[in-house]
Swiss-Prot record:
<feature type="binding site">
    <location>
        <position position="183"/>
    </location>
    <ligand>
        <name>S-adenosyl-L-methionine</name>
    </ligand>
</feature>
<feature type="binding site">
    <location>
        <position position="248"/>
    </location>
    <ligand>
        <name>S-adenosyl-L-methionine</name>
    </ligand>
</feature>
<comment type="function">
    <text>Methylates ribosomal protein L11.</text>
</comment>
<protein>
    <recommendedName>
        <fullName>Ribosomal protein L11 methyltransferase</fullName>
        <ecNumber>2.1.1.-</ecNumber>
    </recommendedName>
</protein>
<dbReference type="InterPro" id="IPR050078">
    <property type="entry name" value="Ribosomal_L11_MeTrfase_PrmA"/>
</dbReference>
<dbReference type="InterPro" id="IPR004498">
    <property type="entry name" value="Ribosomal_PrmA_MeTrfase"/>
</dbReference>
<keyword id="KW-0808">Transferase</keyword>
<comment type="similarity">
    <text>Belongs to the methyltransferase superfamily. PrmA family.</text>
</comment>
<dbReference type="GO" id="GO:0016279">
    <property type="term" value="F:protein-lysine N-methyltransferase activity"/>
</dbReference>
<dbReference type="Pfam" id="PF06325">
    <property type="entry name" value="PrmA"/>
</dbReference>
<feature type="binding site">
    <location>
        <position position="162"/>
    </location>
    <ligand>
        <name>S-adenosyl-L-methionine</name>
    </ligand>
</feature>
<keyword id="KW-0489">Methyltransferase</keyword>
<dbReference type="GO" id="GO:0032259">
    <property type="term" value="P:methylation"/>
</dbReference>
<feature type="binding site">
    <location>
        <position position="205"/>
    </location>
    <ligand>
        <name>S-adenosyl-L-methionine</name>
    </ligand>
</feature>
<dbReference type="GO" id="GO:0005737">
    <property type="term" value="C:cytoplasm"/>
</dbReference>
<keyword id="KW-0949">S-adenosyl-L-methionine</keyword>
<dbReference type="InterPro" id="IPR029063">
    <property type="entry name" value="SAM-dependent_MTases_sf"/>
</dbReference>
Amino acid sequence: MKWSEISIHTTHEAVEAISNILHEAGAGGVVIEDPFELTKERETTYGEIYQLNPDDYPEEGVIIKAYLPVNSFLGETVEEIKQAINNLMLYNIDIGRNKITISEVNEEEWATAWKKYYNPVKISERFTIVPTWETYEPVSSDELIIELDPGMAFGTGTHPTTVMCIQALEKTVKKGDTVVDVGTGSGILSIAAAMLGAKRVHALDLDPVAVESAKLNVKLNKVHDVVTVSQNNLLDRMDEQADVIVANILAEIILRFVDDAYRLLRSDGVFITSGIIQTKKQEVKEGLLRAGFTIEETLTMEDWVAFIAKKQ
């Protein structure tokens, strides 16, 4: 089978949104080439050696590569992708150079092209993300392993916004909690919450592709008895009170349901928000405060911000 590789040179701010556009267009895998990977400090407790080739990364910005099957609809699909990316500017998202190139690869090249970017990664004090084809032994008794298949939609779980959410969940989720994950994507945050001891987790997403992806990952990680995955628009029609609500989505979307989050949380409940670029930090902070939340902690990683807010 022939595949078409679409390569988009953009900004850190636009990575999440463009990745979602590509997944929704039917991409069979997405690769993110971020030059930050070349200088990022990595866990070397056990003598690991990381060797990355600078030629695989842009000098500035980020390159997102997606793989689409070559068929009679390819031209139309590419045009729809271009239009959707341009529309991001309507939401004040900087798409940068937005240079788009297209090339053709065969099945074997595609299968190995994205695997080289994905290895077991320790993303927090307790969690390590492991690709499904890797054999990995926990290095301590309290290490928690999340298995993901990056050939499925919604990336590898190592984006800064996801990492900060998981770190925040580690600090806030208690045994027996009810957790709501808004915009679940791959389901990784719901899986983490279940592994941390939550009694009930509601994983919500409007995108049917995300719902199916999350269901598969939840089953893969054997937490399907705790996590319920549903197609839902934000917190619409949700009435069960929660101890923790987590949302790793665009700042503009967070502000749409901040009041609903406050209403749904129990007293002293926690609202974890991520997916916030630095330029939107103050806007989201003010929205949280207006809704009645207090900011317990602000997390930052690269150009991204996450808030841990509490209902009083």
